[in-house]
Amino acid sequence: MVFLKFLWMGFLCHLCQGYFDGPLYPEMSNGTLHHYFVPDGDYEENDDPEKCQLLFRVSDHRRCSQGEGSSASTLLSLTLREEFTVLGRQVEDAGRVLEGISKSISYDLDGEESYGKYLRRESHQIGDAYSNSDKSLTELESKFKQGQEQDSRQESRLNEDFLGMLVHTRSLLKETLDISVGLRDKYELLALTIRSHGTRLGRLKNDYLKV
């Protein structure tokens, strides 16, 4: 039933360009000549505007035949009251736009008096940030160079230590070889001494037995 009612209302609106003669509720208006016609008289957020939106004038009664024609003739047929109403709404819209622009400008200025001072402050902040970043980069470069120098010094120290260990090991090996050669000579001398003593003991024994 409700769907048929909306369908019939849409058909009537198409025939007579959607003029509505009913009472105007404050919650129906959206600031222009387009108003929301709500069947139950209570506009809510869940109401579909496309199903209950009609174009009507705030004036006396009109016939459907008077609404037919071009938009130019419709605009020319406005009464003085309607023109004042339209102008008043346009002034209100312009005031709201200007108020929004002033708020956005005051928000952009961030407490400054003019854009010049705001831009100078921003340029100073950008310059300070650039100088700080340049200083940080310089410090990083110096630390990197110091690290490279320390690494090179440590590498050279390690090389020197390794070479020193090689030289020391070589000297120890040479000393060990010398000691081993000396021990071998002493061993041969000791063997000769023992053999000579054995020969003498054998000869003395033979001489003793003969006597």
UniProtKB/Swiss-Prot annotation:
Localization (cell): Secreted; Golgi apparatus; Endoplasmic reticulum
Q: Name one GO cellular component term.
A: Golgi apparatus
Q: InterPro entries from the xrefs?
A: Fibin
Signal peptide stretch: 1-18
Pfam families tied to this protein: Fibin (PF15819)
Q: Which domain of life is it from?
A: Eukaryota
Q: Which residues are glycosylated?
A: 30
Swiss-Prot/TrEMBL keywords? Disulfide bond, Endoplasmic reticulum, Glycoprotein, Golgi apparatus, Secreted, Signal
Q: Give the record's family classification.
A: Belongs to the FIBIN family.
This chain belongs to which protein, by name? Fin bud initiation factor homolog
**Gene field:** FIBIN
